[in-house]
UniProtKB/Swiss-Prot annotation:
Record EC number: 2.7.2.11
Gene3D superfamilies with a match to the protein in the record: Acetylglutamate kinase-like, PUA domain
Protein's UniProt keywords contain Nucleotide-binding: yes
Gene name of the encoded protein: proB
Location within or outside the cell: Cytoplasm
Enzyme class: transferase
Pathway given in the UniProt record: Amino-acid biosynthesis; L-proline biosynthesis; L-glutamate 5-semialdehyde from L-glutamate: step 1/2
One Pfam family of this chain: AA_kinase
Native organism: Hahella chejuensis (strain KCTC 2396)
The name this protein goes by in its record: Glutamate 5-kinase
Bilayer-crossing regions: none
A GO cellular component annotation in the UniProt record: cytosol
Length: 386
């Protein structure tokens, strides 16, 4: 099993080197790694994780944790030996267990002088545009403040099933939400193998591949184990979801000593799945190809010059007029005074708000609206020139 496969014309050492440079990681830790065989939290193990997470933070990595374990902790607190089958009982266990889960994370991070925050998400939070933007704004603010967000699904209020589908998918969506550079999925396997390593002694670990390489499909779907390769296809699917925003994914064994800090150092651990494009390229291409625009902004010559020559954000002061019934977060087109479309992007204000602040300096937005979402009408990260 020491043999490592490299699929396609990829250089693993070069690909791994990026882990030493990137600054925002979403790290998913599953129940098998956080609990004592599904019966309550493994506090010593959590302490070791936090030691590594704190070391990453000191090294300049912004960490977001997607944590399982609420149901298992709830079962322990309620004295239940078997996982319940009824949805309302699962939700009750999650509600009880979430208290202990968050307290445990908080206590461990407190040893390193770090603040934590609990974020509970549902599918609707990430499918509704306004709620998505609110969640993104809150998370990015917490990250900028140096707080470690602890994210889980809001199991107590979901109505269709107890889980998002799986926390791998949730972690990938969170990686897209916060525009993470890397998604780290910690599992009880060493990574993705070309064959089931439990029944094939000649199985080889895939060291690096493109996330969308179809050759991986058969490797990930050949077993039905609940915690092993049976869950590997969901991890592959999560890596493909994360790759849409340009994030690379590492699927790696969570019980490897100092696994997170060693990944940061570029050690060849686990399976590295690469996106087809860099994060900023993927986002800009998505913006350029987003055909359905909801409104139109006409810019003065100064704003056009700042956007095209300096790559700056679009401020309200540079906008001459607003047309359309768009809402915050929707796509709008930007035109110069001659009627040429020069850019498009995701707007930070509803149309009725934008009408009130066009031509106004950003520091006056709050006095006009009574609040301020952002100083920019369109942030440069959400803007693409045409």
């Amino acid at each position: 099993m020491s043999v490592r496969l490299q699929l396609g014309q990829l250089n693993e050492s070069q690909a791994r080197a990026r882990l030493r440079e990137t600054r925002r990681w979403v790290i998913k830790i599953g129940s098998a790694l956080l609990t004592n065989d599904g019966r309550g939290l493994a506090l010593d193990a959590m302490g070791l994780w936090v030691d590594q997470l704190a070391a990453l933070r000191k090294d300049g990595v912004e960490v977001v944790i997607v944590s399982s374990g609420a149901v298992a902790e709830g079962m322990s607190r309620l004295g239940w030996r078997e996982r319940p089958k009824l949805l309302d009982e699962l939700q009750a266990a999650a509600a009880v267990g979430q208290m202990g889960l968050v307290q445990a994370w908080e206590a461990q991070f407190k040893r390193h002088g770090m603040q934590t925050a609990q974020i509970l998400l549902t599918h609707e939070d990430l499918s509704d545009r306004k709620r998505y933007l609110n969640a993104r704004g809150a998370l990015c603010t917490l990250i900028d403040m140096g707080v470690a967000p602890i994210i889980n699904e809001n199991d107590t209020v979901v109505t269709d099933e107890i889980r998002f589908g799986d926390n791998d998918t949730l972690a990938a969506l969170v990686a897209n939400l916060v525009e993470a550079d890397h998604l780290i999925i910690l599992t009880d396997q060493s990574g993705l193998f070309d064959k089931d390593p439990r029944s094939n002694t000649d199985a080889c670990l895939v060291g690096v591949a493109k996330a969308n390489d179809t050759a991986l499909d058969s490797m990930a779907s050949g077993s039905s184990g609940a915690l092993g390769r049976g869950g590997m296809f969901t991890k592959l699917r999560a890596s493909r979801l994360a790759s849409r925003s340009g994030a690379a994914t590492v699927i790696v064994g969570g019980r490897i000593d100092s696994v997170l800090t060693r990944l940061r150092n570029g050690d060849e651990l686990g399976t590295l799945l690469l996106p087809d494009q860099e994060r900023w390229v993927a986002r800009k291409q998505w913006l350029a190809g987003h055909l359905k625009t909801r409104g139109r902004l006409v810019l003065d010559d100064g704003a056009v010059r700042v956007l095209t020559q300096q790559g700056r954000s679009l401020l309200p002061v540079g906008v001459k007029s607003v047309d359309g019934g768009f809402q915050r977060g929707e796509m709008v087109s930007c035109y110069d005074l001659q009627g040429n479309e020069v850019a498009r992007g995701l707007v930070n204000y509803d149309a009725d708000e934008a009408v009130r602040i066009v031509g106004v300096a950003s520091e006056k937005i709050e006095s006009i609206l009574g609040y301020i979402n952002e100083p920019e009408l369109i942030h440069r990260d959400n803007l693409v020139m045409l």
